Design a protein with these regions (language model features):
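Active-site acidic catalytic loop and adjacent metal/ATP-binding pocket
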Residues: 43-47, 55, 149-187
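C-lobe/activation-segment region of protein kinase-like
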Residues: 142, 172-206
Length: 206
């Protein structure tokens, strides 16, 4: 198994919770489990009353995925590593995003074979779930507008996010929008048509 690196800010809390190894993370009884691709998933876990986390697990990195990355002229990496890079990039750009608590990647000959990423879970709801629960039409419209403005800010900041699904816009307690599942985000300036297509993609799934 591979080593888990702890962010200094969260080292003490993770030690108290005995979550200092990859083995410990993989034994968590995760809630609200998600599967992004075969072998790639994650879920939530309540560490303490004031701390909920989200764990990404990428434990079956196939040779097909590695070869596909090379064909696309990209160096292969695990989904958890891409998520961590996306978080760091968007955090530096001023977007609201989850905090990285711990990470680990096992590589063979510099090629990724497994990866994990532990995040502090955001407090709030994915946009579609929020809209289903919110009865005030003004609040609903204001929240959708906030998500639209966030997507526009991404575009104006030079980011392309293929996974700009409504469920990846997270409505926080104060009504602000945070972003989740950002492993596909990359630096790319969009022309007017591409920007419009992104909004159409977002609206079609709202």
């Amino acid at each position: 198994m591979f080593e888990l690196e702890l962010h200094p800010k969260w080292k003490k809390r993770l030690e108290e919770a005995k979550l200092t190894s990859v083995e410990a993370l993989l034994q968590l009884d995760l809630q609200e489990k998600l599967e992004f691709l075969p072998g790639i998933g994650g879920g939530y876990y309540q560490v303490a009353d004031d701390l909920r986390v989200f764990l990404y697990c990428d434990l079956q990195i196939s040779w097909h995925r590695i070869l596909r990355s090379f064909v696309m002229f990209q160096w292969p990496c695990s989904l958890s590593e891409r998520e961590q890079r996306g978080i760091e990039m968007l955090h530096q750009a001023g977007f609201q995003i989850a905090e990285v608590m711990a990470w680990g990647n096992r590589k063979v000959l510099r090629l990724p074979r497994q990866g994990v990423l532990l995040l502090r879970a955001l407090a709030g709801l994915p946009l579609p779930r929020f809209l289903r629960q919110e009865l005030d039409e003004k609040v609903r419209r204001r929240t959708i507008l906030a998500a639209e403005e966030t997507l526009q800010a991404l575009q104006e900041g030079g980011f392309f996010w293929p996974d700009c699904l409504p469920e990846n816009f997270f409505v926080q307690a104060d009504g602000s929008i945070a972003l989740i599942h950002v492993h596909s985000v990359r630096r790319q300036r969009l022309n007017a048509l591409q920007a419009q297509q992104q909004f159409e993609f977002f609206y079609s799934r709202l």
